[in-house]
Each structure stands twice: as structure tokens, then as C-alpha cells.
């Protein structure tokens, strides 16, 4: 029995044996290329996967692959040729026991191939699909199985480019969005000008965040964070590289009253445990 599920569902059978697994690699051109501090995204790739157990139950998962976009096909091939064969026709007690076994099995390969990120992302996608499978099989929404209570998730408009950012926010507002996230980490003056223009036009019920995408050094972040505190920001995302020592994140937290966000570039359960325990990371 997994310790991840809600106590009210402890009688649900979480065991499974996968007999089929299929990757789906997709790509859609972006009408407006998305500019980030690490490069420009000209299309939106995606890698999905479907697993089927020995009773015909199915689950869906997704593998991170947004940049560089050529990584989508690579992750699809990793799933098909490396990860899926280790999964097939074996009996697992639960998705988390399978996750632990796959992590252990491929730890050496991740080092040998120099690909800890892609391998971890593929295993994570399988984990999502397996949890989806056992939840669907039990007839329980996955968020409830894992202890969630709210089916509604607020959405925000992301990927807002530095060029014409205020006009982009206006368009997103017209489409119904009330929360917006701007890409920064370019030139400091331009970033601050965009932030000032957007925050000046925010409505009372609107939320605004910025995403640095790990662009700053610690010194650059320490110099810039106090200026950002003058604006109404819900959070500042990844001001420095995600794997920097906790002492550096703590120094940033002391330099600003704005919450700091991170997480999308953590690739192991241990990374997330450390991230959650850091008093510097609020989101």
C-alpha cells in the first residue's frame, strides 16, 4: 500500500501489470515565438504516453520536453527503446514502488549516457500514467485519490514575451485571463520598464508574476530583487539556477519580500524534498 494516497482510499488495489505502452510525440508551430532568457521557442512540442494493464485499463502521462524542442523525439525514443521494456509484464504493488524501481534501475545509465534529465523526465511521465491508470480503474479522480479536495485549478497566461508585453497582457485579459506571467532575464532596463507598464494597468482582481528562467547570477539577482519588490508581484520564478546551494537561495529570500518560485527543473524526489524544506522557496 502506498503512503501517497488519501486515507479514505486505502482499500483500493494499486497493483498492476503493464502489457502495452505507447509514446506519442507531437509538435504545433507557435504563431508567435516564445522568447525566454535561454532561447526562443518556435513551436510547442509534447510527449504523451499511454499504458495499458493486463485487464485493459489505460492511463495517460506526459513527459517534459519543451526546450530545446528537438528533445521531444529523443524522449519518445527513450521511452520506446529503454524505459518501456523495463516496465512490461511485471507485477508492481503500486505506482510509487514502480517509480522507485525504475529510478534505481536507470541511475547508472543516467550517468553513463550523461542524461539524468531526459531519463528522469521519462520515468516521471510513466509514473503519471500509472497513477492515472489505477485511479481510472478505481473510478476515482486522481486528485482525490492523492488527497486533493478542490477540482478547480486557476490558470494563468504564461510565455509572455518582452516585446509588446503590455499588448499581450491586454489580449490575454480579453480572452478571460486574470493572471499573467512575463518572461524576464533580458536587459535590466527593458525588464523593469515592462514590469512597470504591466503592473500600472492591473485590475484589482488580477495577478502578475515574472519568470527569470535561471538567467541571473547570485550577484545579479541580489542587485535586481530589491527593485522588483516595488511592484505587486505574486512571485519571482527561478531567479538563479535551480541547483544552486540552499545558502544562495536563502540570501535571495532575505533580499526581497516577494515570494520566490522554483521546482520545474528539479529532477528527483530528493530534489523536491529539499526544495519543499527550503524556507527560501515559497511557490
Predicted regions and their residues:
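Metal- or metallocofactor-binding catalytic centers and their adjacent structured scaffolds
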Residues: 52-137
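Catalytic core of soluble alpha/beta enzymes
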Residues: 182, 187-283
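Structured beta-strand/loop patches that form or line metal/cofactor-binding pockets in enzymes
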Residues: 3-60, 64-68
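Short coil/turn connectors at secondary-structure junctions
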Residues: 55, 140-141, 150-155, 175-177, ...
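Glycine-rich active-site/cofactor-binding loop and its immediate structural neighborhood
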Residues: 149-178, 183-187
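Solvent-exposed alpha-helices and their adjacent loops that cap or buttress functional pockets
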Residues: 40-43, 146-149, 174, 201-202, ...
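Glycine-rich, aromatic-flanked loop segments that form ligand/cofactor-binding clefts
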Residues: 127-162
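Conserved, mostly hydrophobic/aromatic
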Residues: 49, 56, 83, 126, ...
Amino acid at each position: 500500500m502506498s503512503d501517497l494516497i488519501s486515507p479514505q482510499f486505502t482499500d483500493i488495489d494499486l497493483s498492476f501489470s503493464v502489457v502495452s505502452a505507447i509514446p506519442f510525440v507531437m509538435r504545433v508551430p507557435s504563431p508567435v515565438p516564445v522568447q525566454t532568457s535561454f532561447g526562443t521557442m518556435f513551436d510547442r512540442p509534447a510527449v504523451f504516453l499511454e499504458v495499458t494493464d493486463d485487464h485493459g485499463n489505460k492511463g495517460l502521462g506526459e513527459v517534459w520536453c519543451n526546450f530545446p524542442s528537438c528533445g521531444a523525439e529523443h524522449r519518445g525514443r527513450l521511452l520506446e527503446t529503454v524505459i518501456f521494456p523495463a516496465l512490461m509484464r511485471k507485477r508492481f504493488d503500486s505506482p510509487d514502488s514502480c517509480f522507485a524501481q525504475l529510478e534505481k534501475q536507470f541511475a547508472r545509465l543516467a550517468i553513463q549516457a550523461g542524461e539524468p534529465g531526459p531519463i528522469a523526465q521519462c520515468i516521471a511521465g510513466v509514473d503519471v500514467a500509472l497513477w492515472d491508470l489505477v485511479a481510472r480503474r478505481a473510478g476515482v479522480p486522481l486528485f482525490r485519490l492523492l488527497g486533493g479536495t478542490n477540482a478547480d485549478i486557476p490558470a494563468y497566461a504564461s510565455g509572455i514575451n518582452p516585446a509588446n508585453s503590455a499588448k499581450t497582457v491586454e489580449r490575454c485579459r480579453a480572452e478571460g485571463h486574470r493572471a499573467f506571467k512575463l518572461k524576464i532575464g533580458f536587459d535590466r532596463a527593458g525588464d523593469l520598464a515592462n514590469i512597470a507598464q504591466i503592473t500600472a494597468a492591473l485590475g484589482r482582481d488580477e495577478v502578475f508574476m515574472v519568470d527569470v528562467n535561471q538567467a541571473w547570477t547570485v550577484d545579479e539577482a541580489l542587485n535586481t530583487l530589491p527593485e522588483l519588490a516595488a511592484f505587486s508581484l505574486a512571485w519571482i520564478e527561478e531567479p538563479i539556477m535551480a541547483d544552486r546551494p540552499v545558502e544562495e537561495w536563502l540570501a535571495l529570500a532575505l533580499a526581497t519580500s516577494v515570494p520566490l518560485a522554483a521546482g520545474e527543473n528539479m529532477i528527483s524526489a530528493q530534489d523536491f524534498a529539499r526544495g519543499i524544506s527550503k524556507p527560501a522557496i515559497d511557490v
